[in-house]
Amino acid sequence: MFSAPLRRMMRVTKDEQIQPNSNAPENRKWFPRAPRPLRQFLDTLPRIGTAGSRSATLHVEDEQSPLGATLFDVATGASSINDRDTDASGLEPEKIRRFAWLRLIGTMGALMIAFGALGAGALPVVNNPYVDFPGGNFMSRMLQTSSMIVLIGVGFLVLAWVLMAPLVGIPFKRSGNRTASVSLSMLRRTFGAWVAPIMLTAPLFTQDIYSYLAQGSVTAQGMDAYAGGPLELLGPDNHLARSVPFIWAQSPSPYGPVALSIAASISVITNDSIVGGVLAHRIASLLGVVAAGWAITMLARRCRVSEEASFYLGVLNPLLILHLIGGIHNESILLGFLLVGLELGLRGTDRIQTGLWGPAWTYIALSGVLISCAGLVKVTGFIGLGFVGMALARAFHARGHRHVVAIGVAGLVQVAALVITVVVLSVITGISLGWITGQGGAATIRSWMSMTTNIGVISGFIGMNLGLGDHTAAMLVVTRAAGIAVAAAFMVRMLFATYRGHIHAVGGLGVATFVLVILFPVVHPWYMLWAIVPLASWANRLFFQLGVIAYSTAFSFFVLPRGLALPVGTVFSIYFGAALGFSILLLVGWWSLRRNPTFGLH
């Protein structure tokens, strides 16, 4: 009935899988002995603990899930079976009714966001097509009112999401129930209901989409998007170039050939239509999020974490819906490639451990290609190659290979996948390698969310007040470089922690990316999704989950719908009016529900 390798795997007992052997990476000292003076110096340094030991505490093992079943489930496909998706008859009617109301409240918020965006969204500078939408001409004349409607909608969307937390097993107090009361399919349908209205409206919270459209047109016309900015290449009369934010209008594209080839395809298909291009880019973003959602649930099963809680934090998150779908950022495509590649890579390592070499190499090759494609959207995607590589090296070592051989072979496999992917895509698309030298353009922005930027600006300010002159630019170079160096060192530490088994590859990737975002020269609210989305499928401590809820709730309101700065008085009136309107609607809704407590839908 089973193949010989599978029968051998099934004979492995639980104790044999749990007990580490003497040759395991974590049980052998494999670093060369340092010279005595160096050892004496190292002894004087503060102890920072074993690599990954603190980060690993974000994950709590579920004692009800036997480790011995893991390889069998993965190899036979049993881990893909989920009774909660096929049978919701055991769910409590009261909780189903409550969830249905929350879904409806969130959908109402999404509809308000979509309607308000017709006047408050990131509209094109010329030939605005959204005035022809129902209500668009009317809303476009009222920037402040439209912005209030969007923010009120964000309020209801966020409120519904936050109140769903206990229903997915994330209580607001430590003694609460950690078991999900709703099924994964219910959460997926909720995601569809919340995203559908936003798919059809104007861009939100950023003008970046016009850079994507312009760069796609540049690439489709056979020009090099790395040779100049959209304004230079398309000309000042081009309707796409005129809508690109001034700061990026003369900047080369920082994105890789995968992002540019997608944008070029959309340019050809839509004939540079703004409405068609926005919708097509949104569809691409949605496909990326859907792929990431599939991978999140697979990784959650692998890590023995609640799939419902993982999907709730990583996909249903309003920060993701508002900025990756509403704002149409390339991070959605990046995360789709990255997480699917991560799951396939770990499937390959599982099969190496069980001796299924043929399927293993197929999965590993696909993983390398997909993660390389993630890096060819934005270079931060390449980080995934390192963590899959260390998981692969760990699997090689478990088969009896020496440490140097295991790490060396795994590294060569990942480098080969990267090089082959870059060469093949460059040849097929005809896009140059300018993305390699085109990084760093975003560093011209002084982002208030960036710790290293803030330190540099404060240092320059102190220097000016001390009469030392304005050295802010020089200090920014120093502080930002120091931040990247620290993040790189921490990433190397997490890579070796992954190899030694102190932290799961998913956790190592998420924690390393979190530190990178904290120390990055430029940080936007949605950048934290680089870490939140992978960590959602591994980190199950209540502290982490509530932290994600708090961060996502707060930063869902930090960017105005138009994505541009407005006068202080205007900003105050928008937020004050939105808060007042939200409070009134909330009180009216609460009063209505109190009068009709049994009314509900599902």
Swiss-Prot record:
Localization: Membrane
Pathway the protein contributes to: Cell wall biogenesis; cell wall polysaccharide biosynthesis
Keywords: Cell wall biogenesis/degradation, Glycosyltransferase, Membrane, Transferase, Transmembrane, Transmembrane helix
A single GO cellular-component term on record: membrane
Presence of the UniProt keyword Zinc-finger in the record: no
A Gene Ontology biological process term: capsule polysaccharide biosynthetic process
Principal location listed in the UniProt entry: membrane
Secretion signal, residue range per the UniProt entry: none
EC number from the UniProt entry: 2.4.1.-
MF-aspect GO terms: glycosyltransferase activity
Phenotype of gene-disrupted mutants: Cells lacking this gene are unable to synthesize lipoglycans (LM-A, LM-B and lipoarabinomannan (LAM)).
Residue ranges of the TM segments: 105-125, 148-168, 190-210, 244-264, 274-294, 320-340, 368-388, 404-424, 448-468, 472-492, 503-523, 546-566, 571-591
Enzyme class: transferase
InterPro entries for this protein: MptA/B-like (IPR049829)
Entry annotated with the keyword Nucleotide-binding: no
Role according to the record: Involved in the initiation of core alpha-(1->6) mannan biosynthesis of lipomannan (LM-A) and multi-mannosylated polymer (LM-B), extending triacylatedphosphatidyl-myo-inositol dimannoside (Ac1PIM2) and mannosylated glycolipid, 1,2-di-O-C16/C18:1-(alpha-D-mannopyranosyl)-(1->4)-(alpha-D-glucopyranosyluronic acid)-(1->3)-glycerol (Man1GlcAGroAc2), respectively. Catalyzes the addition of alpha-(1->6)-mannose residue.
Family indicated by similarity: Belongs to the MptA/B family.
Name of the protein in question: Alpha-(1->6)-mannopyranosyltransferase B
